[in-house]
Amino acid sequence: MAENNIQLNEQEEKKSLNFVQQIVADDLAAGKNGGRLSTRFPPEPNGYLHIGHAKAFCMDFGVAEMFGGTCNLRFDDTNPAKEDTEYEQAIMRDIKWLGYDWGDRLYYASDYFQQLYDFAIRLIKEGKAYVDDQTSEQIAAQKGTPTTPGQESTFRNRSVEENLDLFTRMNAGEFPEGSHVLRAKIDMASDNMHFRDPIIYRIILSPHWRTGDKWKVYPMYDFAHGQSDYFEGVTHSICTLEFVPHRPLYEKFVKELAGDKVDEYCPRQIEFNRLNLTYTVMSKRKLLQLVKEGLVNGWDDPRMPTLCGLRRRGFTPESIKNFINNIGYTKFEALNDISLLEHSIREDLNKKANRVCAVLNPVKVVITNYPEDKVEMMEMDNNPEQENAGTHQMPFCREIFIERDDFMEDAPKKFFRMTPGKEVRLKGAYIIMCTGCTKDADGNITEIQCTYDPDTLSGMEGANRKVKGTLHWVSARHCKDAEVRVYDRLFAVENPSADTEHDFRDLLNPESLKVIENAKIEPFLAENAKEGDKFQFQRIGYFCVDQDSTAEKLVFNRTIGLKDSWSKQNKK
């Protein structure tokens, strides 16, 4: 047995391994593939990565990192009609954002088109593949069912010479798309439907974004994938559970390709459960539909489960990776509660985000006994969770804004915010008491009058007296306007994919986006916020600066509220 030079570091040894990591550890201990470990992440460049893909590549890169191996990034670019460099660049950006790097190990399935074509020619010459002229519908009809065998194609017994001639002409562009396919000749009575003479090549006349017009025939996933793994020296091909029935075909083609060298090196396919999340969809087709029909504002809409959407919303790489680690990898499909992801970002931003004051639905408060021209600078903690986070200054004056919901003229007994005749504390400032309010002709409150106690400034002895309510606020004279986009869950139902009675688009949450045009923010925030920065708006939630921000007006996206409001609704 080859000596295994790849060892777990001491920290990892102390952790319990998931089943994929255990398989890898056992293979390395047994000296398989010369004690090497090489994984790969093989996305198709035909869309943006979502959090489900992140679970996959966190495993691919993570297990390689854990055991001192390597992980390749290989684009499965076998369908030129749907692929684009835009997606390629976005995929690479998202992987790097989560903290992974493939180094010089960037590959494409198209790197192996000649080798795959040569392998197909070899199979034809050995009588193991044939050209079929039937339509895809006819071929599907002949496949049979899991309990009844399929029917052999009338073209199954063509001569090697005829098959070689037709396949060569297919690649020369002599035939239209859909007119001919190359099928592996295996067993139309096999219990495994994937063994019933699977299609391994089809005609696509669209130019390829890397190879141009060189090829007119392109390999199917089952034919390209395992062989690409073999060409690259991949030892562990990790994928999701829907590929379990494909594994025997993966192994068959690899063994055909490797021949008598299969005992020296052979990649192994391992499957784990995919990530399914409540209140969203993971289907690339459905997500594309939402984008194309304008039901969301692009792939990076902060309501989308795409990594670029989560990034724009304010999710951090650490929160996503922690969530993925917490839900784990198993062999059983499950629907994961989105509240676990939301908890992960709350936990992360609680440690990292500076606290600031912003008033989303403002009403003016006039402190009638405070000098009109006086301005005091109040010292506000940036983040009490961090010892060295420091403080910032916030101006206080006679007129301030508070949240309209923080005032009630006729309040019930357990209302501890502002109401006439009761005291409340202004965060970092004074204790004030409401003395009255002004209304317009429709009965809407336009102004609240209060008095303050000058001996209750935060830090003074008078500030210690018991007051139940504490409100956030901003100076009316010094605050700036900002746009705030309050995002919520994309769908109104827990599992939109399971609802067979409704079109999934009819299940969208109509309250998933509310735009507040003129929220009031404190000067410190207005002067220091940069695109992507994350803050806690005190008593409201976590927000980040959006890319639509301008020098004149900042735009903030709500990442998540301070508390899970959905759990309360669901308990009702």
Cite the ranges covered by each PLM segment.
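N-terminal Rossmann-like or analogous alpha/beta NTP/dinucleotide-binding catalytic cores
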Residues: 2-152, 215, 242-269, 274-276, ...
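Intrinsically disordered or highly flexible coil/loop and linker segments, enriched in small
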Residues: 33, 100, 129, 176, ...
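Glycine- and acidic
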Residues: 38-46, 71-78, 230-238, 301-307, ...
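Residues forming anionic-ligand binding surfaces in small-molecule and nucleic-acid pockets
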Residues: 63-70, 226-232, 295, 302
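Active-site cores that bind ATP or allylic diphosphates and position pyrophosphate for catalysis
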Residues: 77-79, 85, 122-287, 345, ...
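Core subunits and conserved enzymes of cellular information-processing
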Residues: 243, 247, 251-253, 318-321, ...
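Long, charged, mostly alpha-helical binding arms that flank functional sites
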Residues: 264-344
